[in-house]
């Protein structure tokens, strides 16, 4: 595929350009914050972390919910399929989740640009990527490994 970077440092890059403007039907989502957390935050640090996660992922979550709802809407029998509807039914979403990585649990690490820390994150990312490939490599180009409807609605 073709690498994509929006140049933003304050939030996730938009998914829609990958969906609409790229030739690849496979879209890999790499999460740096968990989609959901168990329990309610109580300490100042827990609340601060959750606020940062929600702010960081709000646009991404809204965009992915849009994909889920648009796909469900396009499934209605009276809808005549155009380019968007065809694309909704041929895109294959995949996701690598970072939950459980202690280095990303705290909100203060999101802005840490210390070389050794970034190298550690790179190695952890490679490990997660290799683990994902070991489980799902055969799905690439064939079918989605992420159920967008179940995950985002």
Describe the predicted segments one by one.
Residues 2-4, 8-153:
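Non-catalytic peripheral regions of patatin-like phospholipases
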